[in-house]
C-alpha cells in the first residue's frame, strides 16, 4: 500500500474459476485458459457470457469468444519467469518489431477504456512496479498442522480416483508437436497387487475405470499403491478425465477387467 501511495489493499477474497463460470457476471476476460482444465461444462457456460480472449493461437476459448485480441508470444516480448527457488529470471524479446502487443499492454489499454487505469503501458513499466514493492519483510504466517483427510469408503469393485497431469500430455500448447508427443509416457491405469488379484488381471491387461458420466479403458500397471486407490493420467492420450469422466481426482469410480 505504501509503495502505491494508497491507504490499504483490497481484503476481499477473489472468485475461483469455477465461481466465475457459475456466476451471473455478463462478461469475462480470459487469457491462457483451456476450459477442459476446469470442468466438462465450462465451455458451454462460458459461451453464454461476453468473452474477451487474449490469445496467441486458436483455442477452445477463441471458438466462443465475442472478441479475440492477439497478444505477443514469449519470443516477441521481454518479461520474466520465477523459478522453483523463487528467483526471477528475466528475458528480452527474441523477435524484434513484432506486430503483436504484450498482454500487459492490452490489459492497460482495456483498463483505461473502462475508467480503471493501471498505468502499465509496457512490460518494463510493469517490471519497475513489481521491483518497487520489494521483498516482504513483515510478519509471516505460522505453519499449522492439518488433520489427515479420512479415506473414502469404497466397495470391492470401487476405488478412489487419483490423478495428475504428465509433463507431456494433451495440453493445448503441445498441439501439432507430433515428434514431441511421441516421447510422452504411455497412458496406463495403476492398481495395487491385491486389486489385480481380485480382478484377475496381470500387467498390461486392459482395465476399465468408469462412473455414471463415462469410462476410460487402459493397460494396467501393478504397483505399490494404496489398495483403495486407482491412478490414471489426467489429460493424456485416451485418458482425458474431465472429458471422459467429468472429474479429475478424489472421486469414487468403478474398476473392472475390460
Where are these regions (language model features)?
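A cross-kingdom feature strongest in bacterial/archaeal respiratory oxidoreductases
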Residues: 2-99, 105-117, 121-258
Amino acid at each position: 500500500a505504501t509503495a502505491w501511495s494508497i491507504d490499504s489493499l483490497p481484503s476481499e477474497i477473489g472468485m475461483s474459476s469455477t465461481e466465475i463460470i457459475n456466476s451471473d457476471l455478463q462478461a469475462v476476460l480470459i487469457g491462457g485458459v483451456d476450459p477442459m482444465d476446469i470442468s466438462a461444462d465450462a465451455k458451454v457456460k462460458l459461451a453464454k457470457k461476453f468473452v474477451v480472449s487474449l490469445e496467441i493461437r486458436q483455442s477452445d476459448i477463441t471458438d466462443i469468444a465475442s472478441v479475440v485480441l492477439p497478444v505477443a508470444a514469449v519470443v516477441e516480448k521481454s518479461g520474466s519467469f520465477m523459478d522453483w527457488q523463487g528467483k526471477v529470471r528475466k528475458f528480452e524479446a527474441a523477435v524484434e518489431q513484432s506486430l503483436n502487443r504484450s498482454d500487459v499492454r492490452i490489459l492497460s489499454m482495456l483498463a483505461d477504456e473502462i475508467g480503471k487505469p493501471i498505468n502499465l503501458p509496457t512490460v518494463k513499466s510493469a517490471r519497475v512496479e513489481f521491483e518497487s514493492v520489494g521483498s516482504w519483510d513483515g510478519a509471516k504466517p505460522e505453519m499449522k498442522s492439518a488433520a489427515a483427510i479420512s479415506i473414502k469408503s469404497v466397495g470391492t469393485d470401487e476405488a478412489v480416483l487419483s490423478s495428475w497431469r504428465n509433463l507431456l500430455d494433451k495440453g493445448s500448447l503441445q498441439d501439432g508437436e507430433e515428434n514431441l508427443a511421441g516421447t510422452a509416457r504411455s497412458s496406463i491405469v495403476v492398481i495395487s497387487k491385491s486389486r489385480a488379484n481380485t480382478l484377475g488381471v496381470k500387467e498390461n491387461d486392459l482395465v476399465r475405470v468408469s462412473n455414471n458420466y463415462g469410462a476410460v479403458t487402459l493397460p494396467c500397471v501393478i504397483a505399490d499403491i494404496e489398495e483403495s486407490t486407482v491412478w490414471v493420467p489426467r489429460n493424456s492420450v485416451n485418458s482425458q478425465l474431465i472429458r471422459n469422466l467429468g472429474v479429475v481426482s478424489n472421486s469414487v469410480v468403478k474398476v473392472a477387467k475390460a
